């Protein structure tokens, strides 16, 4: 074992006893590079009782878990999936995979359901292809972490431009930057 790790010669002689970060760190195992596999480290170093950080004194799971969720105070938490009994408040958005694809619409203030539309009827409602691939559109699409997705490749046409051509309406802009400038100027002048 001193000269091989996982069947590869000479790997065992490099980096021995060097502290390392491993995917198993979250379960309380102190794995170092000299450990052969993850289950070797978990065999004797399992977290079985919670401890207070810094003091290294034992505590109850209730106290440990309440400390874990403390950063969630004054945060907006939403859940997509089956409703569960959590110790903090959250908005249940549903458990359908379709709901997950509507995150951006919810970020923009879209209210799901027919009643919300009846109370405040929109002048124009256009969600055509809301589930479509984001690589063919020039807009602000977000992923599950809220980061902006990729821009369209090459000569791909934007949906607003294609829709105006089909409707036979000439618009005073040709690019997304011109659209943003037009609406920013219009909203500032109001």
Curated annotation (Swiss-Prot):
Reaction equations catalysed: a ubiquinone + NADH + 5 H(+)(in) = a ubiquinol + NAD(+) + 4 H(+)(out)
Enzyme Commission designation: 7.1.1.2
GO annotation, biological process: mitochondrial electron transport, NADH to ubiquinone; mitochondrial respiratory chain complex I assembly
Cofactor: [2Fe-2S] cluster; [4Fe-4S] cluster
Cofactor-binding details, from the entry: Binds 1 [2Fe-2S] cluster per subunit. Binds 2 [4Fe-4S] clusters per subunit.
Pfam families: Fer4_NDSU1
Cell compartments where the protein resides: Mitochondrion inner membrane
Cystines in this chain: none
Ribosomal protein as UniProt keyword: no
Record keywords, A-Z: 2Fe-2S, 4Fe-4S, Electron transport, Iron, Iron-sulfur, Membrane, Metal-binding, Mitochondrion, Mitochondrion inner membrane, NAD, Oxidoreductase, Respiratory chain, Translocase, Transport, Ubiquinone
Single Gene Ontology MF annotation: metal ion binding
UniProt GO cellular component terms: mitochondrial inner membrane; mitochondrion
InterPro entries: Mopterin_OxRdtase_4Fe-4S_dom (IPR006963), Prok_molybdopt-oxidoreductase (IPR050123)
Bilayer topology: Peripheral membrane protein
Subunit structure: Core subunit of respiratory chain NADH dehydrogenase (Complex I) which is composed of 45 different subunits. This is the largest subunit of complex I and it is a component of the iron-sulfur (IP) fragment of the enzyme. Complex I associates with ubiquinol-cytochrome reductase complex (Complex III) to form supercomplexes. Interacts with MDM2 and AKAP1.
The family this protein is said to belong to: Belongs to the complex I 75 kDa subunit family.
Function: Core subunit of the mitochondrial membrane respiratory chain NADH dehydrogenase (Complex I) which catalyzes electron transfer from NADH through the respiratory chain, using ubiquinone as an electron acceptor. Essential for catalysing the entry and efficient transfer of electrons within complex I. Plays a key role in the assembly and stability of complex I and participates in the association of complex I with ubiquinol-cytochrome reductase complex (Complex III) to form supercomplexes.
Listed name of the protein: NADH-ubiquinone oxidoreductase 75 kDa subunit, mitochondrial
């Amino acid at each position: 074992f001193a000269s091989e790790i996982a069947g590869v010669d000479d790997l065992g002689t490099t980096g021995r006893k060097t502290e390392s970060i491993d995917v198993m760190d979250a379960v309380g195992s102190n794995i170092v590079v000299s450990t052969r596999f993850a289950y070797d480290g978990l065999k004797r170093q399992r977290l079985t009782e919670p401890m207070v950080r810094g003091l290294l004194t034992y505590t109850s799971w209730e106290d440990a878990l309440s400390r874990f969720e403390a950063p969630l105070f004054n945060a907006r938490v939403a859940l997509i999936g089956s409703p569960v009994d959590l110790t903090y408040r959250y908005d249940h958005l549903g458990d359908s995979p379709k709901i997950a694809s509507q995150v951006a619409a919810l970020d923009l203030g879209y209210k799901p359901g027919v009643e919300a539309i009846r109370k405040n009827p929109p002048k124009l409602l256009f969600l055509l292809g809301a589930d479509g691939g984001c690589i063919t559109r020039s807009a602000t699409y977000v992923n599950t972490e809220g980061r902006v997705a990729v821009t369209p490749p090459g000569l791909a046409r934007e949906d607003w431009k294609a829709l105006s051509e089909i409707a036979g309406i000439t618009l005073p802009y040709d690019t997304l930057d011109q659209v943003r400038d037009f609406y920013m100027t219009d909203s500032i002048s109001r």
